[in-house]
Curated annotation (Swiss-Prot):
Keywords: Acetylation, Cell projection, Cytoplasm, Cytoskeleton
Subcellular localization, as worded in the UniProt entry: Cell projection, Pseudopodium; Cytoplasm, Cytoskeleton
This protein's name: Major sperm protein 1
Top-level taxon: Eukaryota
Signal peptide (from-to): none
InterPro entries: Ig-like_fold (IPR013783), MSP_dom (IPR000535), Nematode_MSP (IPR051155), PapD-like_sf (IPR008962)
Tissue expression per record: Sperm.
Domain MSP: 9-126
Principal location listed in the UniProt entry: other
Pfam families: Motile_Sperm
Function: Central component in molecular interactions underlying sperm crawling. Forms an extensive filament system that extends from sperm villipoda, along the leading edge of the pseudopod.
Length: 127
């Protein structure tokens, strides 16, 4: 049973943070490469702390071992002098898919008692 084994590692490029540069009167897009470094198929999903400002595409998916996906993180226009820009981040969550499951993302994989791993990527805004 896949859920009894902890999910393996993922690698992201960039590895530790996402940086958006001013001005913020135009939409910015930053690309992140996510690689499944483990030996099992995983389901992954992205969460953001600021749904109004930050968008992700695709927001979830399935990766076989050693497979990767290029994901776009977009930052919509905003007034950096009036809004709090200190605590934004995206969180990548991933878990092993059940044995024999189709390669189609299912939200319920994250709602059972299997282990879910997380990686936080803080957002840095250069003014």
């Amino acid at each position: 049973m896949a859920q009894s084994v902890p999910p393996g590692d993922i690698h992201t490029q960039p590895g530790s943070k996402i940086v958006f540069n001013a001005p913020y009167d135009d939409k910015h897009t930053y690309h992140i490469n996510i690689t499944n470094a483990g030996g099992r198929r995983i389901g992954w999903a992205i969460k953001t702390t600021n749904m109004k400002r930050l968008g992700v595409d695709p927001p979830c998916g399935v990766l076989d071992p050693k497979e990767n996906v290029l994901m776009a993180v977009s930052c919509d226009t905003f007034d950096a002098t009036r809004e709090d820009i200190n605590n934004d981040r995206i969180t990548i969550e991933w878990t092993n898919t059940p044995d024999g499951a189709a390669k189609q993302f299912r939200r319920e994989w994250f709602q059972g008692d299997g282990m879910v791993r997380r990686k936080n990527l803080p957002i840095e805004y250069n003014l």
